């Protein structure tokens, strides 16, 4: 598998909504039971991420007996819809939530719907966070969130199919095109599965190509609304997506399958390359019967 370029929007974290709960005095926290509604995306019980998250919540509740945490877990696309609906109104049922930065987070901070954490994040806490990992959550001089995990978008490759096609695993875009065209000639094989029915994966393909064309700083500026998505590099990234489709590298109908279908085909040896997060390595490793595990 080859590492794919990291995209700015992949940095996610947890932020606190500025409700009266967080304006309460220390005496209230000490005397009364406080319920916090925590929204997240850790829904796979077999995932190490989910298990670590739930263990952290359990430990926190043991250490803070007056705080009860109500968990609200949804898959990515359902989460986006539901959390947007909440914030379109009062978001009274959201206290702590999983979100994307900097662009989408800035929409909420501009609307004054997120609590700045400057007074809560101590130097000790900062010392335990990887340097630079909070930069996307720092807007207008305020820190609004903390990173909950980190990952990269990666290009996972079935080496056996590459050998059958007589091509090497690509390290550049041009090599990706060359390999994809050769792989497309194999019977019943999709060269590159994106799972584009799930919108975030379709976006990840474009985002990765945009990073290649314009660089991380330009992407971040566009996400923050400081520049427009109209320069030639962003246009070229869109043209790259079209090229991949026109050459049959994305399969006949890349919008037909989501991540689950793409994953099944990849594990069954019907897909040569899959674009997914670095967590996908665990999916491969945990699969009982996989054509690519070894």
PLM segments and residue spans:
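Conserved N-terminal structural module of periplasmic/extracytoplasmic solute-binding proteins
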Residues: 9, 23-106, 110-111, 123-126, ...
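Hydrophobic core
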Residues: 12-20
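Extracytoplasmic/periplasmic substrate-binding proteins
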Residues: 41, 104, 239-294
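Short helix-initiation/N-cap motifs at beta->coil->alpha
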Residues: 73-82, 103, 173-177, 253-267
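Short helices/loops that flank or line small-molecule/ion binding pockets
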Residues: 80-92, 161-162, 181-185, 260-274
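Hinge/lid segment of periplasmic solute-binding proteins
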Residues: 100-153, 177, 185, 204-207, ...
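Short, solvent-exposed loop/beta-turn-alpha elements that line the ligand-binding surface or hinge
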Residues: 116-129, 196, 213-236, 286-292
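Glycine-centered hinge/linker elements that transmit conformational signals in sensory
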Residues: 180-182, 223-254
């Amino acid at each position: 598998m080859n590492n794919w370029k990291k995209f700015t929007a992949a940095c996610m974290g947890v932020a606190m909504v500025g409700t009266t709960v967080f304006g309460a005095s220390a005496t209230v926290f000490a005397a009364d039971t406080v319920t916090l509604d925590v929204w997240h995306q850790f829904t796979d019980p077999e995932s190490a991420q989910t298990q670590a998250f739930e263990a952290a919540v359990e430990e926190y509740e043991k250490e803070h007996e007056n705080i009860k945490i109500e968990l609200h877990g949804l898959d990515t696309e359902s989460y986006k819809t539901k959390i947007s609906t909440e914030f379109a109104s009062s978001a009274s049922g959201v206290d702590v939530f999983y979100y994307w930065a900097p662009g989408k987070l800035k929409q909420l901070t501009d609307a004054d719907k997120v609590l700045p954490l400057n007074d809560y994040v101590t130097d000790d806490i900062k010392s335990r966070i990887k340097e630079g990992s909070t930069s996307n959550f720092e807007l207008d001089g305020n820190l609004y969130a903390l990173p909950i995990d980190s990952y990269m978008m990666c290009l996972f490759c079935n080496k056996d199919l590459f050998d059958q096609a007589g091509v090497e695993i690509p390290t550049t875009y041009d090599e990706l095109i060359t390999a994809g065209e050769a792989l497309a000639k194999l019977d019943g094989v999709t060269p590159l599965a994106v799972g584009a029915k799930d919108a975030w994966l379709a976006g990840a393909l474009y985002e990765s190509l945009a990073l290649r064309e314009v660089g991380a700083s330009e992407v971040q500026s566009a996400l923050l609304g400081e520049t427009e998505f109209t320069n030639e590099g962003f246009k070229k990234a869109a043209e790259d997506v079209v090229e991949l489709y026109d050459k049959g590298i994305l399969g006949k109908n890349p919008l037909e399958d989501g991540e689950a279908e793409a994953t099944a085909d990849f594990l069954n040896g019907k897909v040569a390359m899959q674009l997914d997060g670095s967590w996908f390595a665990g999916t491969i490793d945990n699969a009982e019967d996989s054509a690519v595990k070894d």
